[in-house]
């Protein structure tokens, strides 16, 4: 798509060039975007899903707030206490505060990890429907995974989901729920946010 848009403007390049740009600038743009959004909401939703990477079964750990904003994504080989602890430590470091509640599914790896960090009292384990917000957050990645014919390595998967999760929220607007004028405002705000993040990454 990017290749076609640039071709219309007389710029000839191949998809490999676009891929290299994404690998080089994507992580920095994603980091700048997250930094400008500030601290997350006081309720976190955590979940993990299985992904196939080069024929190997791995797990994509994801955290979102109650507004659906992706806080972090980690691709890991295990679904155990150590993996849960790694995600929680990264979240606490980046957010700078313990949330009022941490909602998860029934995975038994979460309670011992939270006990280590002293936040087990914030844990709210629930049924699948109680964590629909983070479950729905997996769907865009599933769609991209199919289009990309699976991820080739853990590093590639981590780079993609980190960048995608930071940028997707800005440009994903439910058009059928807003007026045309509101849609224009959302797009202008998203473009301004993107320009600021990409300028800082250049």
Where are the regions a protein language model picked out?
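C-terminal domain-tail junction helix/linker
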Residues: 145-147, 158-202
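A short, conserved beta-strand element enriched in hydrophobic/aromatic residues
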Residues: 60-64, 69-79
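Two-metal-ion RNase H-like nuclease active-site motif
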Residues: 40-53
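Short, basic alpha-helical nucleic acid-contact segments in DNA-binding proteins
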Residues: 12, 20-42
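Mobile genetic element proteins and their domesticated derivatives, centered on retroelements
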Residues: 2, 18, 47, 63, ...
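Active-site beta-loop-alpha junctions of metal-dependent nucleic acid enzymes
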Residues: 24, 73-96
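RNase H-like two-metal-ion nuclease catalytic core shared by retroviral integrases
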Residues: 126-146, 157
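DNA-recognition alpha helix
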Residues: 1-11
């Amino acid at each position: 798509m990017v290749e076609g848009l640039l071709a219309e403007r007389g710029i000839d390049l191949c998809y490999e060039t676009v891929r290299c740009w994404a690998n080089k600038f994507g992580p920095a743009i994603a980091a700048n975007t997250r930094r400008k959004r500030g601290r997350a909401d006081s309720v976190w939703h955590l979940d993990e899903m299985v992904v196939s990477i080069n024929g190997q079964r791995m797990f994509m750990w994801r955290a979102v707030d109650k507004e659906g904003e992706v806080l972090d994504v980690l691709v890991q080989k295990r679904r155990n206490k150590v993996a849960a602890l790694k995600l929680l430590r990264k979240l606490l470091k980046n957010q700078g505060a313990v949330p009022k509640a941490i909602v998860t599914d029934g995975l038994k790896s979460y309670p011992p990890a939270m006990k280590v960090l002293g936040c087990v009292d914030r844990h709210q384990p629930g049924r699948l429907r109680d964590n629909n917000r983070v479950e729905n957050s997996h769907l865009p990645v599933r769609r991209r995974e199919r289009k990309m014919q699976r991820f080739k390595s853990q590093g590639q998967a981590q780079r993609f989901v980190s960048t995608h999760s930071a940028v997707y929220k800005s440009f994903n607007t439910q058009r059928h729920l807003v007026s045309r004028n509101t849609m224009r405002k959302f797009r202008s705000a998203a473009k301004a946010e993107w320009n600021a993040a990409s300028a800082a990454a250049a």
